[in-house]
Amino acid sequence: MHSSFPTSLLLLCCALTVSPTVKAQPALDAPNQSVAPENHTLTDTTSQHLLPNALFPLTQKGISQKQWLWGVGHSNVLDTYLSPLEYTGPHFTLLHQSERKARWGRGSVTTHSLYAAHAAYLHSPTDDGKAWDGEFSAAGGWLYNWQVHPRWRLAVGGWVEVSGGFTYNTRNGNNPAQGRLGLSLNPSILVAYRFPFFQKTATAQLQADAQLLGVQFSPSYGQSYYEIFSLGHTSGIIHFTLPGNCPTTRLQALVTLPVWGAKLTLGYLADIRQSQLGGLKRHAWRNTFVLGYTRTLKILR
């Protein structure tokens, strides 16, 4: 009896020690436990693949981004049809642009439109001459997009732009005003970068376009509007434009910040329009600080 009790106690201790090990082993090999980590890994990988679309939702169907900007700046205008002097002064700008995914291009193409209006009150270098200058432009086209990095977007394309405007000089009695009308094809490039901003996402964007070719209305040197519209002397008023005789470019540098549930947009706009047509020179150099807002909308169909 006394010899069998220690032996039984030893066997019982071994059984208690081995039993948890035997019960824990099936838990490590159970199918439902081994699949869970794999599913978790697949979910993380899928999220990484969807990250570019989350950062740049314009590649998703039905997403449209609209932007309204108001600006104030300084203009430098020369129009030798009216005066050999440069007129300078403040100007105001209204800008509206939108972008959405195109119906073609397999998700890599976006449709881009831009509407701009400028109004300036100018004065001569001696401040004894005043002038008003106004211009409106409307452009539309496409951009091909590359997601070069989850935070970076590169787009290249172009658009067709229609522009028109006038300059009115208060000192001139015979020919006080000059009108403008043009059609052009403009290549465009856009670079955008998204970065964290107080636990949200902000966007910095740089876009530039330049006039490649087009047509433009302009009277020739010494040709009055009375001759054109009353006498029918319309020879030479339509000119083909190229970078050599009409170097024109536009540059936008914008930052969009999430503020109080909205998207505040601010930045700089440079609008440089120049021409040398029919023996006349003209330029309008506009430097503008812009402020506005951006909205991202989902189109329901």
Model-derived features: where do they sit?
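Short loop/turn motifs that connect adjacent beta-strands in outer-membrane beta-barrel proteins
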Residues: 57-64, 101-111, 145-155, 196-203, ...
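Outer-membrane beta-barrel "beta-signal"
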Residues: 285-301
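Residues that define the transmembrane beta-barrel architecture of outer-membrane proteins
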Residues: 86-94, 130-138, 152, 177-187, ...
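Transmembrane beta-strands of outer-membrane beta-barrel pores
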Residues: 72-78, 116-122, 160-170, 195, ...
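Outer-membrane beta-barrel transmembrane domain signature
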Residues: 174-261
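Transmembrane beta-strands of outer-membrane beta-barrel proteins
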Residues: 64-70, 108-114, 152-160, 185-187, ...
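Residues on the lipid-exposed face of transmembrane beta-strands in outer-membrane beta-barrel proteins
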Residues: 72, 94-102, 138-144, 158, ...
